[in-house]
Amino acid sequence: SEMVKIEQKGYITNIFKSNLVNKDKNYDYVDASTVLGSSSKFGKGNEDKERYILDGNKVVYINNKGEEVTEAETALDVNKNFITTWRVNANDKIVLPFIVDQYFQGNYNCTIDWGDGSEKEHVGGENSTAQRPEHTYTQAGDYNISISGKCSYFVLSANAYSSTYPELLKKLIKIVSWGTVEAGGYGFGDAENLVEIAEPTKKTFIKCEDDSFAYLFAGCKNLEVIPSFLFRYVNENTTSFEGTFERCEKLTSVPEELFENAPNATNFEETFAYCKNLMTIPTNLFANNKQSNNFKKTFAGCTKLEEVPYELFDSTPNAIDFDRAFYDCYSLKTGPKIWERANASQISGNQRTYAHCNSFDKTGLSTDILNKYFK
């Protein structure tokens, strides 16, 4: 039988394709706790190396040795609703970060389930007043707010939301499901207690009309894990990941597959800047981003980095901006030799790529190289 790879969160196991529910189909990967809940006979779905894939209304389970394949029906459509979890105190009011402008009626036509048993609320559509939906919770707890229908924008930084409701930024703790809600632009910047992001389970991820994921999760300082296939369904014209994970202070690693489906991405400025606990960067992180030209401050302030693969930028022949790419990476000992690139003559100005990298091995480097890349 043909072998197939099931990949999730960095773990790869081979199983026989003939054992799968539909061997000719491209499978979607899913966190089983989202689909099945913690009472499933499959367990909680978060044990390391246990993996699940979704095929229609069947969930296929691969055990942690890759030797057993079972399946179960699920009544839950994980792809329908956009679901976020909020942690509230008694009598807290949650206001959702909808964009309130003249296009409100066209951007929203959705039903909101506030997750506490209260009556569902319809927002948007014709004759609707442009105002952010809000709800007060009588009891403290974690509540799943589920949105179905059309919800084009959900942006914590827009319309002065973050300055008007700074305390609400701390209450968003999970993105449980991305849903099919015609998402045009989302932003979770400075949601400092966001700890979990769902993997998209089919082509329903943010459309990003401006072709940018700029600062999408910037300042999510308690986020520990980025799903491997978070950007699996991005618009292929996506060009910018500027600041996407900037100041995600608890990240220790980055999945190698993260940007592989964004072949036209050009801008990685500050993408992981000030991720002060980041310890490893995979060699092939930018392997499919051959159009990239901007790595300004990409890893600046990543003070725990000690070694960066020499080949990290080898697949990006057009890149000419490495200004402060590893600035203030005090612990960094080795990294890409920018001065040996084929296009090194096109890299102009004082790059300061490794400025303040006090641990870096500078053996044999010329004064010109030191002045250009290390001062």
Regions found by a protein language model. Give the residues of each.
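Extracytoplasmic/periplasmic/luminal assembly and interaction segments
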Residues: 32-46, 50-52
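Negatively charged
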Residues: 66-375
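Short linear proline/tyrosine/threonine-rich motifs used for host-factor recruitment
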Residues: 53, 59-63, 68-70
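Conserved hydrophobic/amphipathic alpha-helical signal-anchor segments
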Residues: 1-35, 39
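A short, compositionally biased
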Residues: 47-48, 54-56, 104-108
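Conserved beta-strand and immediately adjacent loop positions that scaffold enzyme active sites
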Residues: 12, 58, 109-111
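Acidic surface patches and DE-rich sequence motifs
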Residues: 45, 54-55, 63, 114
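Intrinsically disordered, low-structural-confidence terminal and linker regions
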Residues: 42, 52-53, 66, 76
